[in-house]
C-alpha cells in the first residue's frame, strides 16, 4: 500500500520573501490562498533533525497551540509534509520593540511601564498555562504592526518547557547568558521564577538603555549574576522613580522563592497606577544608550551567524537550533540563546550520580544504594560466576557480610569515564574503578574492576537498571 504524503501546506499556502533564519529553519511570509490572509511560516527541515530535535519541535508546537493571548505571537496551524514541518504564526510586522523605542521622538518611564506590563501579561498567561518561556530577551519582543501603540508580542517558544504548578526541577542549562537567573547558573532546580528574573533584566534596560549585568568574559558575567551584583548608578538612575527601582529589586531577587510573581508584578503601583506613579519625563539618554545597545546586539548576532555558517560549511556537524558548543564559551555570545543540556552538564550529572553510588558501596550503605537502583536491576558481576543476577537480594548479602565487617578505610577512583547519552532519560557510563583498601593484616592493597552502568531517570531521579562488572570477585575476610 502506498504511503500517503501530506501536501496540505503546499496546496493551501503560497510562500513569499524570507523574514528570518535559524540553523534548521527559515521564516517566510506566506498567504493562505483562499482566505487571502497573511501569516509567517516557520519552515523546519526535518531531514536534518535528530530524534531529540524532533521531540523539541513537537514540544514547541504543543506549547504554542496552548497559548492564546493578545501579547503572544499566535500559532494558527502546524503541518507536517515530507522533509519539512510548517508552523504557521501571526505575521507581526512592527519589528523588535527595542528598535521601535529608539525611533520614537518621545520615550518616558510611563512608556517603559506600559511595555513591561504587556510582557508581564504574556508571561502570566504562559505561567497560568503551565509554560515557562526560558528565553525572554529583546530579540523575542516584537510589535504587532508599525502603527503607534501597537501591541507587544512575545515570540520564539523554542526553549519553552511545560511544568506542573509551581514545580521546580533541573530542566537543563538553557537561555541567553545576560538574562540567565542565578538558580540556572547554580544548576539548581528551577521553574516559573526564571522568567521574572529575565523580566527584571529587560525592565532595567528599558529604563536606562544598558543591562544590569555585563562583562565581556562570560565566567565573570555569571559570577555577577549569581551574586546579584547590580546597582543604580548616577546620574542616569537619579531621574528614575523609587517605585521603578523597587520593582526591579523585586524581580532581580536572588532567591527564586522570594522573587515577585507575574501576577504580583502586575499589581505593583508602578504598573497598576502608572499615570500617577511613573514619570512622564522624556529619557533622551536612555534612547541614546539603547541605540548603542541595539547596535552591539546586532553586531554580535552577525558575528555569531558568520561563525556558525563557517562551521557548518566546513563540514562540522551543527549543534542544532542556532546553538553550537564552541560558540557558547565565546564572549560574543552574551545575547545568543544557548542550550547546554545535551552535552557537558548532563554528562557531569551522570559522573556525579555514579560517584554517589560507589560512595554508598564503599560505606556499606545499603539504604542509599537501594534508592539509586531500580528494584528489578540486572547485573553481570564476578561474584555471580557468569550468571545474570536480578533484583537487590544478591547484593544485600555482600553489604551485610563484607562491607559491614570491613570498617577499614576504602578509597575509590574512577578512571577514564565514557558516557553515552541515550535520549533525555537514559545514559550509559563505562569506566575503570580503582579501589584502595587495607587488608586483614593492615597492609594497603589495590583492586581494579572494569564497569559499565546503565542509568535511567524516573520522576527526575536517576536509577541503575543494569550493570556489568569484571575483575576479581570480592572476598570475605577470614
UniProtKB/Swiss-Prot annotation:
Top-level EC class: transferase
InterPro entries, per the entry: Ca/CaM-dep_prot_kinase-assoc, Kinase-like_dom_sf, NTF2-like_dom_sf, Prot_kinase_dom, Protein_kinase_ATP_BS, Ser/Thr_kinase_AS
Residues the record lists as Phosphotyrosine modifications: 13
Region (Disordered): 314-341
Known regulation of activity: Activated by Ca(2+)/calmodulin. Binding of calmodulin results in conformational change that relieves intrasteric autoinhibition and allows autophosphorylation of Thr-286 which turns the kinase in a constitutively active form and confers to the kinase a Ca(2+)-independent activity.
One Gene Ontology cellular component: nucleus
Needed cofactors: Mg(2+)
Biological process per Gene Ontology, one example term: response to ischemia
Annotated segments matching region Calmodulin-binding: 290-300
Protein's cellular compartments: Synapse; Postsynaptic density; Cell projection, Dendritic spine; Cell projection, Dendrite
Highest taxon of source: Eukaryota
Active-site residues annotated for this sequence: 135 (proton acceptor)
Phosphoserine: residues bearing it: 257, 330-331, 333, 404
Binding sites annotated in the UniProt record for ATP: 19-27, 42
Enzyme Commission code: 2.7.11.17
Family: Belongs to the protein kinase superfamily. CAMK Ser/Thr protein kinase family. CaMK subfamily.
Oligomer and partners: There are 4 genes encoding calcium/calmodulin-dependent protein kinase type II chains: CAMK2A, CAMK2B, CAMK2G and CAMK2D. The corresponding proteins assemble into homo- or heteromultimeric holoenzymes composed of 12 subunits with two hexameric rings stacked one on top of the other. Interacts with BAALC. Interacts with MPDZ. Interacts with SYN1. Interacts with CAMK2N2. Interacts with SYNGAP1. Interacts with SYNPO2. Interacts with SHANK3. Interacts with GRIN2B. Interacts with CACNB2. Interacts with LRRC7. Interacts with GRM5.
Record-given protein name: Calcium/calmodulin-dependent protein kinase type II subunit alpha
The organism of origin for this protein: Homo sapiens
Phylogenetic classification of the source organism: Eukaryota, Metazoa, Chordata, Craniata, Vertebrata
Gene: CAMK2A
Amino acid at each position: 500500500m502506498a504511503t500517503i504524503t501530506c501536501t496540505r501546506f503546499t496546496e493551501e499556502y503560497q510562500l513569499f520573501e524570507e523574514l528570518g533564519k535559524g540553523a534548521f529553519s527559515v521564516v517566510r511570509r506566506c498567504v493562505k490562498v483562499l482566505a487571502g490572509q497573511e501569516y509567517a511560516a516557520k519552515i523546519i527541515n526535518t531531514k536534518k533533525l535528530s530524534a531529540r530535535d524532533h521531540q523539541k519541535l513537537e514540544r514547541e508546537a504543543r506549547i504554542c497551540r496552548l497559548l492564546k493571548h493578545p501579547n503572544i505571537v499566535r500559532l494558527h496551524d502546524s503541518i507536517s509534509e515530507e522533509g519539512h514541518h510548517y508552523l504557521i504564526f501571526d505575521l507581526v510586522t512592527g519589528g523588535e520593540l527595542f528598535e521601535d523605542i529608539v525611533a520614537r521622538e518621545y520615550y518616558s518611564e510611563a512608556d517603559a511601564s506600559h511595555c513591561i506590563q504587556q510582557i508581564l501579561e504574556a508571561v502570566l498567561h504562559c505561567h497560568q498555562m503551565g509554560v515557562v518561556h526560558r528565553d525572554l530577551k529583546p530579540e523575542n519582543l516584537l510589535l504587532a504592526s508599525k502603527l503607534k501603540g501597537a501591541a507587544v508580542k512575545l515570540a520564539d517558544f523554542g526553549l519553552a518547557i511545560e511544568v506542573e504548578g509551581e514545580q521546580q526541577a533541573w530542566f537543563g542549562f538553557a537561555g541567553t547568558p545576560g538574562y540567565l537567573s542565578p538558580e540556572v547558573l547554580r544548576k539548581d532546580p528551577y521553574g516559573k521564577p526564571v522568567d521574572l528574573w529575565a523580566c527584571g533584566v529587560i525592565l532595567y534596560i528599558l529604563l536606562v538603555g544598558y543591562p544590569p549585568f555585563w562583562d565581556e568574559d562570560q565566567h565573570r558575567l555569571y559570577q555577577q549574576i549569581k551574586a546579584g551584583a547590580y546597582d543604580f548608578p548616577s546620574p542616569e538612575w537619579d531621574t528614575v522613580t523609587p517605585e521603578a527601582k523597587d520593582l526591579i529589586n523585586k524581580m532581580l531577587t536572588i532567591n527564586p522563592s522570594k522573587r515577585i510573581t507575574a501576577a504580583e508584578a502586575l499589581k505593583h503601583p508602578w504598573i497598576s497606577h502608572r499615570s500617577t506613579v511613573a514619570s512622564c519625563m522624556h529619557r533622551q539618554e536612555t534612547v541614546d544608550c539603547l541605540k548603542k545597545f541595539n547596535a552591539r546586539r546586532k553586531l554580535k548576532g552577525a558575528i555569531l551567524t558568520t561563525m556558525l555558517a563557517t562551521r557548518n560549511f566546513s563540514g562540522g556537524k551543527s549543534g542544532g537550533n542556532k546553538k553550537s558548543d564552541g560558540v557558547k564559551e565565546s564572549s560574543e555570545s552574551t545575547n545568543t540563546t544557548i542550550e547546554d543540556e545535551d552535552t557537558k552538564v548532563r554528562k557531569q550529572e551522570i559522573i556525579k550520580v555514579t560517584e554517589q553510588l560507589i560512595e554508598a558501596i564503599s560505606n556499606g550503605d545499603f539504604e542509599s544504594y537501594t534508592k539509586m537502583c531500580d528494584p528489578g536491576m540486572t547485573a553481570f558481576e564476578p561474584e555471580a560466576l557468569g550468571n545474570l543476577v536480578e533484583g537487590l537480594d544478591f547484593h544485600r548479602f555482600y553489604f551485610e557480610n563484607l562491607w559491614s565487617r570491613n570498617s577499614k578505610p576504602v578509597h575509590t577512583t574512577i578512571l577514564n569515564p565514557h558516557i553515552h547519552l541515550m535520549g533525555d532519560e537514559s545514559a550509559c557510563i563505562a569506566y575503570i574503578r580503582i579501589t584502595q583498601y587495607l587488608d586483614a593484616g593492615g597492609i594497603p592493597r589495590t583492586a581494579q574492576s572494569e564497569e559499565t552502568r546503565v542509568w535511567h531517570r524516573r520522576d527526575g531521579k536517576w536509577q541503575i537498571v543494569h550493570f556489568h562488572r569484571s575483575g576479581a570477585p570480592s572476598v570475605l575476610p577470614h
